[in-house]
């Protein structure tokens, strides 16, 4: 069970690595994120939020999901399971509207970095490059299960 925010953040980051990869493979961007939290009494809660702009970045998705988690989860009980979903998917070539306060150069630089990381992972394997925090003892199963929904979609 996860007992504090410091244990939850690496799990969010690990889960969003796969989300970012799948978004790139399917040429989609997420315009929102949803989290599903189940505590050790098996009580579940789900929340969702919109992102500032559509993205494929695992880090931006993880940060948005974690901000939502910190805002909504009250820590009555330890967490048994966490699910993160990219929602409101749009094609990756959809024009994005920026505002006056966005640092578009920083965003583009981060997107290029994410693309480079994705290229390295495709060439040398998905664990060839990782965030340093993910090398600590993650409180999640080593093997993630792949669930096939009745519609044929993979989760």
Regions found by a protein language model. Give the residues of each.
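Basic, low-complexity intrinsically disordered segments
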Residues: 1-155
């Amino acid at each position: 069970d996860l007992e504090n925010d410091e244990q939850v953040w690496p799990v969010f980051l690990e889960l969003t690595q796969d989300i970012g990869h799948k978004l790139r493979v399917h040429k989609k961007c997420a315009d929102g994120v949803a989290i599903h939290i189940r505590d050790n009494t098996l009580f579940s809660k789900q929340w969702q939020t919109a992102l500032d702009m559509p993205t494929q970045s695992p880090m931006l998705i993880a940060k948005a999901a974690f901000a939502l988690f910190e805002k909504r989860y009250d820590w009555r009980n330890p967490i048994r399971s966490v699910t993160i979903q990219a929602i409101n998917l749009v094609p990756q070539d959809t024009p994005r509207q920026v505002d006056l306060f966005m640092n578009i150069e920083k965003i583009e630089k981060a997107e290029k970095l994410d693309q480079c990381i994705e290229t390295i992972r495709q060439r040398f394997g998905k664990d060839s490059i990782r965030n340093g925090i993910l090398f600590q003892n993650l409180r999640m199963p080593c093997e993630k299960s792949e669930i096939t929904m009745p519609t044929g979609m993979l989760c």
